[in-house]
A protein has these predicted regions:
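Small-residue-biased structural context
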Residues: 1-234
Length: 234
């Protein structure tokens, strides 16, 4: 069968949908309900995931330089990597205010989180407005570029398996703004496989598989059979 065309940039862009799901569909209901314990656990998961994603944008010393630097490299500084690094510093401060509010009670936590959500969602839009038109102009093939500049940085954080599991679980449960859970999961996982080496994919495949519901995973593999290894003939 002919598999759908892979969208390599989805390994980065679709994670914005994961973060939006976290903010709007997971964390906001918990904050509004005053369920501090459940919020604390979900917030801890979110913080690890967004830290890996930010590293894939900003780069990690000794590993990939990040997506913003990649776009600056190919388009004469047009992405503004330094500007986005500065935004990430500010984002981290607003994020820390939420963590600091956890022991202060439900009302303080909700207020801090809503301020953070507004900042974070505006930041995601700003990145998309600047970066996506540039991504569309990158030379092909793009998979080696994203592997070198972004994925290597994510792996260097030591939390890339969390990034994969968190992303797949979110998309499998909530989908994305423009796609069903099945479609959103497929697009992200297909991109992830494409930017991984075979050895890396052998490591991350079981993580992705276990993070999706069985029905979602079956639907994804039905469309992209190459995600799963072909059993050896006996």
């Amino acid at each position: 069968m002919t598999e759908p065309e892979v969208s390599v940039p989805a390994v980065m862009r679709n994670y914005h949908e994961v973060l939006r799901n976290d903010l709007a569909k997971l964390l906001t209901p918990l904050a509004e309900a005053g369920d501090v314990a459940a919020f604390d656990a979900a917030w801890a998961d979110y913080r690890v995931a967004i830290a890996v994603h930010a590293a894939m944008e900003d780069g990690v010393t000794g590993a990939g330089g990040g997506s913003a630097a990649m776009l600056d490299h190919y388009f004469d500084g047009a992405a503004g990597a330094a500007m986005f690094k500065a935004e990430h510093v500010e984002e981290h401060a607003v994020q820390q205010a939420v963590t600091d509010a956890l022991p202060l009670g439900a009302a303080a936590l909700c207020a801090a989180f809503m301020a953070y959500r507004a900042f974070a969602e505006a930041h995601l839009l700003h990145e998309e407005d600047i970066m996506m038109p540039l991504v569309a102009r990158l030379p092909v093939p793009r998979a080696p570029l994203f592997a070198q500049w972004c994925v290597s940085a994510g792996i260097a954080t030591g939390d890339f398996e969390h990034f994969v599991a968190h992303g797949v679980r979110s998309l499998a449960n909530f989908g994305s703004a423009k796609n069903t859970p099945e479609g959103a999961t497929r697009v992200f996982v297909h991109a992830l496989k494409t930017v991984c080496t075979p050895t890396q994919w052998a490591q991350y495949l079981p993580v992705a598989r276990s993070a999706a519901t069985p029905g979602i995973w079956a639907s994804v593999v039905a469309e992209v059979p190459s995600l799963e290894p072909v059993p050896a003939a006996h």
